[in-house]
Amino acid sequence: MQQVSGLEYANVCPSVARYDFHSYSGGGRLNIGAAALKKGVNYTPRLLDIVYNCQLCGACGVSCNYAMDMEVLQPISEFRMQCVKDGKTHPALDRMIAGLKQTGSSVPVTGARGAWAAGLGLKDVAKDKTTTLLYAGDQASYEAAAQKIAQAAARLLGKAGVDFGIAGDAELSSGAAAYEAGYEAVFLEQAKQNAAYFKKAGITTLITVSP
């Protein structure tokens, strides 16, 4: 606590700051998970509210690792995956997954996936030989603010003399949002498809904007 400069900076977990109850903290979720391993899970609306109100930001892990060596975020993520496997999903996340399956993106599609790179003169890894891929991801492909990050990354790589390319419209979603939402099977399928694409294109090095 000696590192906290004031009360206004004491809260790091969004959900425990909002609900002010230990179950909504990282430690509280670990306790719930440990109890579930011993006695099984009795799903209730409040339990699912606790599970899905975690932003998986990792602040709990940073706080705990200041004083002890333990993994906090992974068990919380695994418990969410178990909820999904048991059919206890969240409607908003169900809609996101449905959109991913339908459009290939975890965020709304606003145009061509590779449009963010227009005018930058970047290589297309499907046509131009290179072993390094700059992977933009869903947000940097379709959201204006994130597109600026991808564009800046491309310019920096160019100035550094890095020989790289992009997948453009052929780029696939990483499935990271599906993983964070607890949909492990969807994530693994996206990973499988990406691995196949990288192998076919001869990619050996990935530079990722997201995730």
Where are the language model's segments positioned?
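Ferredoxin-type iron-sulfur electron-transfer modules and their immediate structural context
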Residues: 1-54
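Iron-sulfur-cluster electron-transfer modules
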Residues: 31-208
